[in-house]
Amino acid sequence: MFSHLLKPAARSAGLLGHVNRRYLATVHTNTAREIPKPSRKPTPISLENATFTIKNGPIFSGKSFGAKANISGEAVFTTSLVGYPESMTDPSYRGQILVFTQPLIGNYGVPSSARDEHGLLRYFESPNIQASGIVVQDYALKHSHWTAVESLAQWCAREGVPAISGVDTREVVTYLREQGSSLARITVGEEYDADEDEAYIDPEAINLVRRVSTKAPFHVSSSLGDMHVALIDCGVKENILRSLVSRGASVTCFPFDYPIHKVAHHFDGVFISNGPGDPTHCTSTVYNLRKLFETSQLPVMGICMGHQLIALAAGAKTIKLKYGNRAHNIPALDLTTGKCHITSQNHGYAVDPTTLTSEWKEYFTNLNDQSNEGLIHASRPIFSAQFHPEAKGGPMDSSYLFDKYIQNVQRYKDHQSSFSEKSNKPSPLLVDLLSKERVGVHPAQPDFEMHVPGRVEQVDVGGPVAPPYQPITAAA
């Protein structure tokens, strides 16, 4: 059936009987990084061997269909049936090898990098693949969808991301479920000593948020309203920005360690985004949020990593889950209404609700493992969700949380405008920010580096800040 796709050497070696959808191909790289023209032709097959090795665990052999690169990271799994382009570009997956439980991946190809009326990516959650590598059981040689412009194999090769097929992902997930998320490695076309510790780099030991956060403030305008929200970018998804601007809030995004409490008075609300890794690495963000809570009455909302950072700023603690929650169908109970919502989730840490002070209450709880899924302040307009109400992909059951936040922001803005002495003239800071172009996040690298790239320096807010933040230069 697939004999016309095999290399001559493979055909003469009698390998045809062993070839099916799971044995995938090496793709030609697009050195100019241009999106190719739409094509439904099957990707040529290469029988290059690849290995997926779990540290101190099983070794799986398969076939490479992505970049020829060796990487290591934390092996995690998602049970989502669809949405692999969104998942792979989600900054929360930075440093992780993503195992898909859905047996057939790649059947609808990869869409273009088209942008919507707000200048946001329509089909991706960031400009580049953020996962270190992917593991699938079967890869579809043929893809078909009206938005597709290239195959999953071509995309992975162009982005420098290794991918392996022909792996029994059921066995992988069973192991990870019982043993917990583990360090792992993908190797393409060569052998190595899997017992060497240096073959595995632990991304949890790195401040991953620093790698995916914007390097300088940028602005996304909304023509649908006059609210203005400051967003702390810990690795924000495009659909979070879209969920805010489509509701009439212009958004100014700041680096994760920006001293937001020093500029909060310029805004009508503060939002803390999702992000990858261990939240305890973000010590300066926690410090800045704590100062914000002490000096401001602004409405605040956090999602995923933002939820955890709010909890840490409030004095609570976080815990690492055994294998995390990564799916589009996880039930979360709203403790204020008793209603259950099906939610999209992607996190490996959770807030320990037993460490909350009396000012904070649980908002949501996970009905699968009883972990905390949200917080709400007893008297102030501050709340958070561990899951993703913006979905992309996933159900939209909880999208009303954005409506609730926008209502809080509008109420605060209306209250502030009732004071005649409040000036409506834009501050020099905001005038400066409106002229800034967005600085994209760095794409995932084939091998994880301990080196942290330098930050672009822009706006000086002055005054003492929490280490390790380094003030940025320019007039405020």
Curated annotation (Swiss-Prot):
Residues of the transit peptide: 1-24
Subcellular location: Mitochondrion matrix
Catalytic activity: hydrogencarbonate + L-glutamine + 2 ATP + H2O = carbamoyl phosphate + L-glutamate + 2 ADP + phosphate + 2 H(+)
Keyword check for Nucleotide-binding: yes
Known pathway: Amino-acid biosynthesis; L-arginine biosynthesis; carbamoyl phosphate from bicarbonate: step 1/1
GO molecular function: ATP binding; carbamoyl-phosphate synthase (glutamine-hydrolyzing) activity; glutaminase activity
A single GO cellular-component term on record: cytoplasm
Function, in words: Small subunit of the arginine-specific carbamoyl phosphate synthase (CPSase). CPSase catalyzes the formation of carbamoyl phosphate from the ammonia moiety of glutamine, carbonate, and phosphate donated by ATP, the first step of the arginine biosynthetic pathway. The small subunit (glutamine amidotransferase) binds and cleaves glutamine to supply the large subunit with the substrate ammonia.
PANTHER family: CARBAMOYL-PHOSPHATE SYNTHASE ARGININE-SPECIFIC SMALL CHAIN, CARBAMOYLTRANSFERASE FAMILY MEMBER
Subunit structure of this chain's protein: Heterodimer composed of 2 chains; the small (or glutamine) chain promotes the hydrolysis of glutamine to ammonia, which is used by the large (or ammonia) chain to synthesize carbamoyl phosphate.
Name of this chain's protein: Carbamoyl phosphate synthase arginine-specific small chain
Organism: Phaeosphaeria nodorum (strain SN15 / ATCC MYA-4574 / FGSC 10173)
Gene: CPA1
